[in-house]
């Protein structure tokens, strides 16, 4: 693929990276799919695959060689995530990549309420200091994962109070990514907020889920203490439980309620509302139709570089 503007896509077998890769292929863009397992790489027109993980800087460097732009999908939540992200940034710099588009988190800050959001801020700073041109896509909570927050008893439990969150779908984020990846220019040095067109409370989300799943889904507002206690029996490490709980705490703090027009402006269409997402994606709440979730509430398939 020498002589073309090659885009390297990490996480190409994951929920977000895979969506981006398919859209790039539909547009006839040349891309390199960076995956851990070549056997899982999708076969797409105009795409080649390279095996590399975020824990292997040398393979990353080889995988990025010849790419002009990199889509850096954030790694799975991990206490060592910053080191993994540093590997990606260093490898991209060494390989001669010119620009990185990074999937960050809405309201990322060094002391933001949502503990996993802090890694995103530090990663943004790492990218900005690398000499690479950059574009940040700060994603609000994924509407795709709301059904996974429902317990086996049909209750969403968390300390979100009556505050709102402007969740967004991965399809809409992918549409934005495909719009900004081929274009440097006006997107360089820009941070875009990825939200839906509305901000809903968890109680309102439960009502929508009830309507589509055909059973009663409710929301119970916990205190912070109750939230940590109700998750203690899962046996998850403390940092992971803190991430689950502070997802709701960030909502209660008003951190996730602002609605942005960036998706509509960049994707060329309005982002999906929750009801529209549920109507289009019945498989997202199939587990709510009588069978218990396979994993603890609050958990969701990680977006990382799979």
Residue locations for each model-derived region?
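Conserved SAM-binding strand-loop segment of SAM-dependent methyltransferases
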Residues: 48-51
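A hydrophobic C-terminal alpha-helical subdomain
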Residues: 225-306
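Oxidoreductase cofactor-interface core, primarily capturing Rossmann-like NAD(P)-dependent enzymes
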Residues: 2-44, 55-68, 76-86, 90-99, ...
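Short, basic/glycine-rich phosphate-binding loops at helix/coil junctions
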Residues: 71
